[in-house]
Amino acid sequence: MEPTEFTATVEDATDEARIRCTGDLNGRADAALEAAYAAASALGHTRITLDFERCGYINSTGIALIVRLLTEARADGRSVRAAGLTPHYKQIFEITRLADYMEILDAAPTGAASTTDGDGA
């Protein structure tokens, strides 16, 4: 089975930046996720939510990319939340202790947001 191309769309919400992840989060997602983080950071919010609702697969390299983004965000004074995770990936985030460093939401965030050009695809 071929991996599904990863894209990340950045949205500017009232109190946060949202990165909506689509496709497979693996080593090929590096540039897109990095570009999305840069675009989200440029919005100036202190909180970023990673929405994984449309993310089909996350491998160990994808977890490492999330760790790097989380480290970068913390160094920049931003908090990161995860939303839209399947029960399986919630468990992975707990096992890998990512859940110790980011809030895990039960559902993807809703509410008004405008999309910015930061998909990095």
For each predicted feature, which ranges?
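STAS-like cytosolic regulatory interaction modules
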Residues: 1-56, 68-121
